C-alpha cells in the first residue's frame, strides 16, 4: 500500500495556510507527510468520499516527495489524472481511488512546481464516468514541505 500508513497516531508538526504537516514513527523510522484538501471541487457526483493530496517522506525506505492524490471515488480503470500548475501539466496513473506520478524524478518535479506555483487543478474521471475538477491553493505548501523535510532530515 503506497498511501500513508495509519499504524501510529500522527503528530501535527504545524499548519501552513491550506496545508498541514505531520510526523509519525514506524518500526524503521520516521515518516513525515503534508496534507491538503481542495478549496473547490466541481463535478456532477451524488456521493464522494474524502478528497486530499499528500506528499510523503520515508527516509528509511529511501522514499521522499512521494505525491499521492486521493479522489474520494474509484477511478475509471486505466484512466489518468491530470494536475495542472500554472500552465504546466503532470500526468498521474491511477489505482482504485488514488493517483501517483510513478517515479522519484517526476515526484520531485511535481513538488518543485507545487512549491513555485499558486494553484493546482486536478482533473479525473470516476469508474461511473463522472468527471471531477479539484482546485488546490498552493499557499503554505512550501512552508509545509520545509517542515516535513526538516522533521525527517530530508534535503
Indicate where each model-derived feature is located.
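A generic "folded-domain core" signal
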Residues: 5-155
Amino acid at each position: 500500500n503506497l498511501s500513508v500508513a495509519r499504524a501510529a497516531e500522527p503528530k501535527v508538526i504545524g499548519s501552513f495556510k491550506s496545508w498541514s504537516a505531520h510526523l509519525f514513527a514506524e518500526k524503521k523510522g520516521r515518516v513525515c507527510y503534508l496534507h491538503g484538501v481542495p478549496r473547490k471541487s466541481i463535478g456532477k457526483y451524488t456521493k464522494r468520499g474524502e478528497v486530499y493530496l499528500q506528499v510523503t517522506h520515508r527516509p528509511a525506505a529511501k522514499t521522499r516527495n512521494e505525491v499521492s492524490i486521493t479522489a474520494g471515488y474509484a477511478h475509471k480503470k486505466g484512466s489518468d489524472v491530470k494536475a495542472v500548475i500554472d500552465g504546466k501539466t503532470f500526468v498521474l496513473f491511477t489505482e482504485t481511488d488514488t493517483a501517483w506520478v510513478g517515479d522519484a524524478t517526476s515526484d520531485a518535479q511535481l513538488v518543485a512546481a507545487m512549491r513555485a506555483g499558486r494553484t493546482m487543478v486536478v482533473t479525473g474521471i470516476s469508474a461511473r464516468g463522472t468527471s471531477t475538477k479539484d482546485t488546490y491553493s498552493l499557499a503554505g505548501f512550501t512552508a509545509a514541505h520545509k517542515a516535513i523535510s526538516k522533521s525527517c532530515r530530508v534535503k
